[in-house]
Amino acid sequence: EGKTLTEVLPVVENLLAHSKLYIGLSTLDNLVKGGRISRAKGVVSSFLNMRVVMELKNAELIPVIKGRGNKTFLKWFEGFKEELKQTPNLKRIGISYAGETEQLKLFRDELQELFPEVMITFFHTTPVISTHTGSGAFAIMYYSE
């Protein structure tokens, strides 16, 4: 409050340097509609029941894992928990979702059990984001010092 841009900018840069964001998509239909992927890729991924998890890195979404069905998310989550265990000074975890929450509540509960001292925020994403991602999408982000 009352800070100048030159005072705030280093704080924001530090926050970005110590944060990670992963996005999981259950369907690529909305990415096809938005022109982000081709119609052919969308049809194939829908037919094969593809799921994808991506990491936001330097303003780009980098695929981390692709697979068929919800087992893809479970496999990714196991590796994600290990990543968090190796992260020093973990401060906060956020889980955002569009639509279905059952699996994500289990993720949240497992993370809270592993990291009881870390605040975990669990919230529905904004309509703008859910329009682009479609139902069943989620984001998990964390911040460390």
Please place each PLM-identified region on the residue numbering:
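Mixed-charge interfacial surface used for oligomerization/domain docking
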Residues: 1-133, 137-145
